[in-house]
Amino acid sequence: VDLTQEIGKAKRYQSLKFFGMKSEVDSDITKQFAALTVEISPNVRIVIYRGTDETLIGWKEDFMMTYSPIIPAHKDAKEYLEQQAKVFDGKILLSGHSKGGNLALYAAAAQEKEVQSRLGKIFCFDSPGLHRSILETEGYRAVVPLAMRYIPQDALVGLLLESEIPYVIVKSNAFAALQHSALTWEIENGQFVTMDHLTKNSQLNDQTFKKWTEEVSDEELELFWDVFFELLFTIGLDTINDVFGKFMHYVQEFF
């Protein structure tokens, strides 16, 4: 609440209007979804999709994308954009960080041509790609020219799955996986500080993960992730913070 109040005081954001906040977590169908629409000007709005939160339900849903073309949050993302397009007839931009960018791209690709004709840029910040089958659809092909993709130099999440969208490499002041936080990305004169190449570590991780998912069937991937997360749930872990805290305690006790 304090941050919201401070944003309201800033000249840059005082004229913005917020609409349609939606947030849902459903463990029964493995879904974590959140979105918000912001009016930038009378004729332009931006639909912003939230990335994965701290819940393991959200993280499990992320890894479902390695074997399933469509996850529960994709359906919500598509319906949310459809609804916003019905109540607003101007230009609609889309954006999201991490899974949020993935949802933005999927939602845009899944729209009817009339809605797609009103879409502006789609900003994906260190966001996973999509299942390879989605890349073959007419809807995806139609929105690829609109998409802009940004990843840090030691990217991991932003290289997962498949994408045909060129990326801009942003310099981060953090280490390894901590670069996933956009708060660590460097800005100079109002622009991202960019780099020419990904780190060798990022390239190796990307090659290793893609090789593994290509060699394993979708059925085997589904079984692996189901067993992996069920293990975490069984020992009482509910959030990613639990994994880095309690889980390491269990490992130390075991050994």
Placement of each model-derived feature along the sequence:
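Short glycine-enriched nucleophile-adjacent loop
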Residues: A104-K113
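Gly/Ala-rich beta-loop-alpha elbow adjacent to hydrolase catalytic centers
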Residues: S95-G100, A104
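Alpha/beta hydrolase fold serine-hydrolase catalytic domain that processes acyl esters and thioesters
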Residues: V1-R45, Y49-K91, E112-F255
